[in-house]
Amino acid sequence: MAKPKIKFVPDSLHVKTGDIVYVISGKDKKMTGKVLKVFPKKGKIIVEGINIVTKHLKPSQVNPQGGVVQKEAAIFSSKVMLFDEKTKSPTRVGYEVRDGKKVRISKKSGEII
């Protein structure tokens, strides 16, 4: 029998809820969107307007009509980079201690995120 694959899950994510991110791979490559939700244990995020999937809903008490709904699905956080508003391009995230607090900075512009 083959060994089971070990899934890699990062200790922490480089993006937070509310960040503007740039998709670097996949079907939505070169698109930007706002992070709506973060799943750190799975290493995934949900981005507004990215990875839209069609979901078929059965009729229920909440939704008696049922039907077809389009919504955002989660993508791996490694597929996105933080989008720098100042340089209008994707950037890596760095960390610095300023005034006794650890802050995230943009590697391209040096600005605090």
Swiss-Prot record:
KW Ribonucleoprotein (keyword) present: yes
InterPro entries in the cross-refs: KOW, Rib_uL2_dom2, Ribosomal_uL24, Ribosomal_uL24_CS, Ribosomal_uL24_KOW, Translation_prot_SH3-like_sf
Gene Ontology terms, MF aspect: rRNA binding; structural constituent of ribosome
Keyword rRNA-binding: yes
Swiss-Prot/TrEMBL keywords: Ribonucleoprotein, Ribosomal protein, RNA-binding, rRNA-binding
Entry superkingdom: Bacteria
GO BP annotations listed: translation
One of the Pfam families matching this protein, by short name: ribosomal_L24
Gene Ontology terms: cellular component: cytosolic large ribosomal subunit
Described purpose of this protein according to its UniProt entry: One of two assembly initiator proteins, it binds directly to the 5'-end of the 23S rRNA, where it nucleates assembly of the 50S subunit.
Record's subunit section: Part of the 50S ribosomal subunit.
Family under the similarity heading: Belongs to the universal ribosomal protein uL24 family.
Protein name as annotated: Large ribosomal subunit protein uL24
Organism: Fusobacterium nucleatum subsp. nucleatum (strain ATCC 25586 / DSM 15643 / BCRC 10681 / CIP 101130 / JCM 8532 / KCTC 2640 / LMG 13131 / VPI 4355)
